[in-house]
Amino acid sequence: MSPISIILFNRGLARAAFVFAAIATLGLSADAQQQQTQPAQEKSSSEKAVEPENKQSEADKRVEMNLLGKTNAAAGENRRNENIQFNLVNNNALKDLNVRLGTTATIVREFDPANGYFGAEFGNAPKSSISVPPPIKSGFHGQLYDTHQNSVTTARSFFQVGGVKPAHENDYGFNLGFVVWRNAKFFIDVSQQKIRGSVNGNVLVPTPDERAPLVTDPATLAIVARFLNAYPKELPNRTDIDPRALNTNAPQSIDNNQANIRLDQVLGSKDSVALQYQFTSQSVDAFQLVAGQNPDTDTKSHLARIVWTRSWDAKTITTFSIGYDRLTSLLRPEENAVGPFVSTSGLTSLGPDGTIPLNRAQNQIRTATQIRSTQGAHDWSAGFGLTRRQVNGDETDVHRGFFSFANDFGVDAVTNLRMGRPSQYIASIGDIHRGFRLWDAQLYAGDKFQVNPRLNLVYSLRWQPATKPTEVNNLNVIPYDSDWNNLAPSFGFAYRISKKLGVLRGAYGVHYGEIFFVTYQQIRFSPPLNTKTVVTAPNLLDPLGTGAGGQIPLALPTIYALDPKLATPYSHQYNLSWEPDWNKSARLQFGYVGSRSHKLLSMWYLNRAHPTPGVPQTTETINQRRSDPEIADYRLVVNGSRGYFDAARVSLVLPGWKGLNIDASYWFSKAIDLGSSYTNTANEIDSRKGRSQNEFETQRDMKGLSDFDQTHAFLWRMSYLFRQTKLPRLMSTLIDGWNISTVVLVKTGTPFTVGSGSDAPGFGNVDGNGGDRPNLVDPTILGRTIADPDTSRQLLPSSSFQFINPTDARGDLGRNVFRKGPIHNVNASLHRSWGFKKDLRFTFRAESINLFNTPQFAEPGFDLSNPNFGAITNTLNEGRTFRFTLQIGW
């Protein structure tokens, strides 16, 4: 623990807790900082001074690098419950934020042609083709800070058994700016975050009478015993939730490091050059509630930029930049992992999942140029950007092997595990190292035209071609062509109606996304260089060898394919807003934002097993009942989904009224898709989330609410600065200068789907794929919010559903027709700065996240065949936390 942290905990914790209790009693609310679009990082006072030096935004880094330990407290976010694990690659952090918090309906005032706005209507930051850094502040300036959080002041999460385990978090750093020589300014920013904690969570483990193998063969018994011994020795202690529920703890450590260096040089009266290098890393020694459950992760990011700016005259500026980005990700199994990935219905899986290990390096070489010129009533801009993308490394697809134990063969899944009788085995063998290359480009031009004092127009055209990826050693050939017709027009206007009626604004634009690397790289897993084999009802001891009775199992390869017509996803985004000028002290906005997204990525699971005359409809005969008897699944990536989003939003900003700042927003929205949203990569978990019950009529079967849909959302932020209070002198001296701020976030819960939980006869359609849903018996339960552990089973009774017959194609229950519990969160902070001498200041800040210790419940058990169906067993957030910051700035 750092010296500053020790001082804080020896002298201030009890008093700070009392202050926050008083704040809660008074009902103070909301931080008046400008709202950050989700997702973003929690910002304390120690971080804000760094931003003008053009440190890459923490929001972007959090999503790009999948950083843990970050919370956007200013937007009402609570600290996430770390026991809801996701692999720290791809865009998994963004998807976690969307499902856990939902999205923020965002009205973009105007579309800058230099930026890409795909997904911006949901609150995501636009992607810029060129970044022009703001100048470094003049003079000698800097700051030193330390933020500390400790389990001493942390409340238990809702389901936690026993006290909070010892944990602490330190976030400390410094930044410094000064003139190094004539017309040259230097800036450095260095920080570290050390998290040493204990993750609490519920896992499903065998009951006392399920801990012994039921198999007698010594070799098979050894494997079954190894699987069973991977579960904690502790017995279930939350049998009120589920007969197998165990609440337990496991240690986790996270190290985050960041360094940012800038040098700005003025070259004469017209030219300036900025050089920047930024390094970010994260190392995660993951928690293991079950032995080997989660991978350990090392992530490193390097960013280098050179930006040359030339002012030709007072009206024309050109900018040229060249940059290099490198992101490396290494995910590896923990040493106690059992080897293969083992999934048992009714128990926590033995991981990590089939994509581990993973070793990936991504390089981007960027160059861009831009010109802006003002000519009379026109403000012209044009630019060009070119990016060379390189991705190298090893990716896996159950190369460690995968066993599935399901409710099958007339008994439950745990009994099948104890008997060593899996329903399915999948394994991949082959060369998994690849190197892919492609070019991205942007060419754009636009104009801001002031038609008259009351009307402004904005219009632009952006061309965003994407070339066909290539594999450097020609080991794989991408079947689709380069996408050359990605034209993206945009238009906007601002019209002042009258003095009191204010301004009417509108904007429309076409915006393109991307075909993700993780999407097209899957072709590496197809024959002939790689074979993914599926065996039904295998022999546990030798799943690819001879089975019972000396018979060789029917093992078939899985094919990964890309649609030859695969194209870049895009969206039409539009908004209309009215900003009346009824009061000079307040800003009010009424608005609508909508989008229609097309060609969203999804994976279709084809060549499934179908009812065949004369062949029993059982798990053992799945491979015999496929249309193409030579292969197992044919997994085809297509532009198979569309997205629909509409939202109405009203916002009120009251800045600086007698020390009071208020920022409040409410939005009413609806998001629908055909199984895949704008974040779907059509890979692994994403592909299964978008998998239909049957291979036919996929879009009809999957149409429903998006995973991040929320009907209502309300964000209220308020801060108050005590100054010149009319109190006795001593009290006024103690109170004046303190700033109290609070953030209140209230949102509808996001939706979830009830599934059958098994593809086996008596549960599913026995087609070799999961995703089956039951039939609905009681339609009155549709749309229910399952938000209370005490009533969840009553609100979602198993009697309201019925398993389908083995020969039925699908169940009639829709996708995402129920909702998990809502978000009710309050964050608060108290801070004050003291000035000493010239420009020297000292700041103390105390913050609480989830001030009222309100749980945000996860969805209940949603697999009808499992004993925990309908039971809420987890929360999406942590309990109340406090943290304290000391900062010295000059």
Predicted regions and their residues:
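Hydrophobic, lipid-facing positions within transmembrane beta-strands of outer-membrane proteins
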Residues: E82, K127, F140, H168-F174, ...
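Residue-level signature of outer-membrane beta-barrel architecture
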Residues: P133, F178-V179, Q265, R310, ...
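Transmembrane beta-barrel strands of outer-membrane/channel proteins
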Residues: L144-N150, I188-Q192, L275-F279, F320-R326, ...
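Short, solvent-exposed micro-motifs at the edges of structured domains
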Residues: H168, K468, A567-Q573, P580-W890
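Solvent-exposed loop/turn elements at secondary-structure boundaries
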Residues: P340-S343, E471-A488, G492-V638, N769-G771, ...
